[in-house]
Every structure is written in C-alpha cells, then in structure tokens.
C-alpha cells in the first residue's frame, strides 16, 4: 500500500469521517423564534478534532454575548425563558459583525488545519440555530462563510435514533454525561454538552463496529 492509499483509508483523520465536512457545534440564545426579525443574543461554538486514538473530542471554543441588531424584535417571554438581561452592562455584548467575523475566522482556520473542504453545523434542533446564524451572516455581510448553506447534523435526531431520547438533558443522561439544569439555556453550557453528546455518539458507533461501515459480504 502506498502512502497516499494509506492516508485515503486512515479513519483516524477527521477529513475522512464526514466526507470532507468539518463539524462545528453551535448553540444560540435569542429573543424569539423568527431569525429574520428577532434578536440574536448569545452565540457559542466548539470545533472538534480526532485524537491519536481516532476518537472525536472537543477542541476550540468561542463565545459571545451579542447586542440586538438595529430594529430587532425583543420578545419578553423569550428573555424570561433564557434569563438574559439585555441591559446588563456586565454582559460584555459585542455587535453581530464582531461575533460572526470571529466565529468564521476560528472555523476557517480549524477547517483548513483538518484539511476539510467545508464546515457543517452541529446543533440540538439544528434548524433553529442554523437559521439564526445564517440570518446574522446575511445581515452583517461578513464574507467567506465556511458553513454549508443548508446541510447540518441535528443531535436531537441522532440521539433519538441512538437512545430514543430527543431532549438534550435526557440524551445526555442516556450517554452518562452530567447535565446541570440550572445552567441550561446558556449558549456556552449547552454547546459544551452538545459537543460532548455528539462526540460520544460518533465514538460509540465506532466502538460498536459501525464505522467504518462494512457490507456483510466484505466481512467474510
């Protein structure tokens, strides 16, 4: 086997695990459900890497409290739910432009280091998080968006398939990942737990022999 062939079959390389996609775990906290009109208030992201044993582990983190964009709708019920005080100066909130620029910069650098072709959002009920991230990217006009425009890995779906649980706290409990309900609905905390959950599911499938996939006749 040549060196090129060996690399092409090396499942310890992240670029070979998801067909060249680079997973980035995301969570957002918002002032409503409409990504076009409601404020994005908090954003966290965690990249992943393969360790020397070929197991997926969390890597780099970025986290921002975000100022509502001009004219944004603020739903009081949403603020009551996530506990965010948008007028608290200790939030250290930045503009959407700063947050999206720094996020894209971190992701592009990590994606390049992993030799992947495109990044893909991983989130719990991912369509929600993706819609707010993409809306913010469009509003700010930040260029070189590394994320696939519509593809995503939804850990609610994946954990439903693997554990029969779709709620984040229940899925974490099934995976024996500690979850503090008092810290839930912090974008950073939820991203950290979602990253652990995603890595656990990917690694557990590998331990069970489900990846790399082999057809029945290939095992003979």
From Swiss-Prot:
Sorted UniProt keywords: Exonuclease, Hydrolase, Magnesium, Metal-binding, Nuclease, tRNA processing
- InterPro entries listed in its UniProt record: Exonuclease_RNaseT/DNA_pol3, RNase_T, RNaseH-like_sf, RNaseH_sf
Query: What are the names of the required cofactors?
Result: Mg(2+)
Which parts of the sequence bind Mg(2+) 2? 27, 29, 185, 190
Q: Which domain of life is it from?
A: Bacteria
Active site at: 185 (proton donor/acceptor)
> In chain numbering, where does the site feature Important for substrate binding and specificity fall?
33, 81, 128, 150
Q: GO MF terms on file?
A: 3'-5' exonuclease activity; magnesium ion binding; nucleic acid binding; RNA exonuclease activity, producing 5'-phosphomonoesters
**Single GO biological process annotation from the record:** DNA replication proofreading
According to its record, what are the GO cellular component terms?
Answer: cytosol
EC number(s) from the headed UniProt entry? 3.1.13.-
The entry's free-text remark on the cofactor is:
Binds two Mg(2+) per subunit. The active form of the enzyme binds two Mg(2+) ions in its active site. The first Mg(2+) forms only one salt bridge with the protein.
The residue ranges of the Exonuclease domain are 24-198
Q: Which Gene3D superfamilies match?
A: Ribonuclease H-like superfamily/Ribonuclease H
Family (UniProt): Belongs to the RNase T family.
So what does this one do? Trims short 3' overhangs of a variety of RNA species, leaving a one or two nucleotide 3' overhang. Responsible for the end-turnover of tRNA: specifically removes the terminal AMP residue from uncharged tRNA (tRNA-C-C-A). Also appears to be involved in tRNA biosynthesis.
Subunit annotation: Homodimer.
The record's HAMAP family line, in alphabetical order, gives: RNase_T
Task: Identify the NCBIfam families for this entry.
Answer: RNaseT
Q: What is this protein called?
A: Ribonuclease T
Source organism of the structure: Pasteurella multocida (strain Pm70)
